[in-house]
From Swiss-Prot:
Species annotation: Klebsiella variicola (strain At-22)
UniProt record similarity statement: Belongs to the RutC family.
GO biological-process terms attached to the record: nitrogen utilization; uracil catabolic process
UniProt-listed Enzyme Commission number(s): 3.5.-.-
Domain of life: Bacteria
Official protein name in the record: 3-aminoacrylate deaminase RutC
Keywords: Hydrolase
Nucleotide-binding among keywords: no
Role played: Involved in pyrimidine catabolism. Catalyzes the deamination of 3-aminoacrylate to malonic semialdehyde, a reaction that can also occur spontaneously. RutC may facilitate the reaction and modulate the metabolic fitness, rather than catalyzing essential functions.
Annotated InterPro entries: RidA_CS (IPR019897), RutC (IPR019898), RutC-like_sf (IPR035959), YjgF/YER057c/UK114 (IPR006175)
Amino acid sequence: MPKQVIIPPGTTTPIAPFVPGTLADGVVYVSGTLPFDKQNNVVHIGDPKAQTRHVLETIKSVIETAGGSMADVTFNSIFITDWTNYAAINEVYAEFFPGDKPARFCIQCGLVKPDALVEIASVAHIGTPT
């Protein structure tokens, strides 16, 4: 099965040469997702919970556009700028993964825009869309 580009309706053009997601062999690969509005500006500056919610809603949109759901997520790569935000980010993260949790890692690092506090990339196994 060839690779399929996944771009949810209303998605802005990324600021670099990539797409929001790709689907190949029943697996959705979601690009690193930042708390950006449609003009690629950081939203909810200073609020790690709101930024995390925005990021996960964006990821959810990509996965649902591909025919899956957040329950299909098997792995998340999480990048945060400050460990003091870790608990707040986890609180919102748990809302999106209430059942069995996906595997993940979380590292502290700098992000592409200074006001961004969190970035998440995801992998979801959705099987063959019907």
